[in-house]
Amino acid sequence: MAVSLLSKLRCITVDVTGTLIAYKGELGDYYCMAAKAIGLPCPDYKRVHEGFKLAYTDMAQMYPCFGFHAKMPNIVWWKTCVRDSFVKAGYEYDEETFEKIFRRIYSTFGSAAPYSVFQDSRPFLRWARSQGLIVGLVSNAEYRYQEVILPALGLNKAEWDFGVFSGIEGIEKPDPRIYKLALERAGNNIAPEEVLHIGDSMRKDYGPAKSIGMHALLLDRFKTEAAKDWTEAGAIVLPDLVAVQQLLESDKLKC
């Protein structure tokens, strides 16, 4: 006889960026503002943003997990990425000028300034813990998320029990091993079928979590075109964490 999923869950894991928090504006905006702040002409926002996407992709391929396996310091990884972002956008600065720009960018993204917390994030995490569930975060993010950024945003250990961050662990989504590591961190011999993972990517969240036996569902906060494909592929897709809580409490999800 089928029973409600909530009654069987012992742990919920949650993606961070796009699920609990979001960037304010485009990343390229902050790069341009940093250049402008030291008296330089404002670079073209769109070009810099596109340059960043290319540079970030290159760095993630050459030095995954923010340089973890190459033992590259986090600040060096980001300095290379930021420099390449500007170069790919057609902007090259001398070393002294670039250092001033970079210091501003690195400091900004190590603070709460460029991020916002979705209104339903804290209430959902608190609700989950009130149900006796262990709450974990699983994110392709560097160490500053855990140590600085999330606490500065008010998402501290009062809201979650453990975190698995790619820049600290050396494993990143969509590698299923990051979800196996989350199971280990949850402790208490929790089995995959006792865990629900919530994220915003079919490839990085839903697929690998399901592949190791976890339950999973996806959020479509920004009404993406891909959401229709997710639904057609069999995923449960919801607009926000309020809807997730309502669905779990309704006992409509069975296992």
PLM regions: where:
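Intrinsically disordered, low-complexity regulatory segments enriched
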Residues: 82-83, 132, 165, 235
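Asp-based, Mg2+/Mn2+-dependent phosphohydrolase catalytic module
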Residues: 1-12, 43, 92-93, 122, ...
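N-terminal helical cap/lid subdomain that shapes the substrate entry/recognition surface
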Residues: 2-118, 123-126, 130-131, 147
